[in-house]
Amino acid sequence: CSLIHGYSLGFKFTFEADYLDDKNWVYDFGNCKWIKKYLEDNFDHTLAVDMNDPQMEDFKQLEGKGLAKVVEMSGVGCEKFAEHVFNYVAPQITNETAKRVRLASVEVFEHGSNSAVYLNTENV
């Protein structure tokens, strides 16, 4: 890749429902293409930078030179990425399924031994 970017991340989503649909599924994972696109747009070959980073102008200059794709976020790191993705996906899943399905958690992996989980605490 020709762009400066961070490390590889993995994402795990856990969905929950009080009852299964007519196919005996919690959620049809074939409907997850919009989630994949969101993850690619925000995390694939991107440079995630905290919106308050004092060097933001430097990062933007790299982007202007075609050296990076900068994604501004309110905090960075696996913990914040898990929270950020959860807050994007959860309401859409709830709306898409007429509140039948809830996003229970998002886990973000840095590599095999490190991860952070953001949990839905509304249903605990």
Feature locations, PLM:
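Charge-rich, low-complexity N-terminal segments
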Residues: C1-V124
